Amino acid sequence: MSMPALFKDRLSIPVIASPLFIISQPDLVIAQCRAGVVGSFPSLNARPSGTFEQWLQKLSSELTDKDAPFAVNLIVHSTNPRLEEDLALCVKYKVP
């Protein structure tokens, strides 16, 4: 199986950094991506909810095509009132 184009020449090792509750935030994700691993965070770490779009703006503006991609952990449980809004923002910002 070959490496998908999104990862080719962008990863130093094939690792996804754990999306740590409360701990993971844009600066950590940017550092992870620049180190050559997939940076990730739970969308619910962005509080209040309007903060999530600011986080995606920061990631989109500071990461380049040479950095590893990032991932958003969306909580799809029925008790998450932000799911639809957060998913729409992921689509808007073309989260890899």
PLM feature spans:
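Active-site entrance/lid segments in N-terminal catalytic domains of soluble metabolic enzymes
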Residues: 1-96
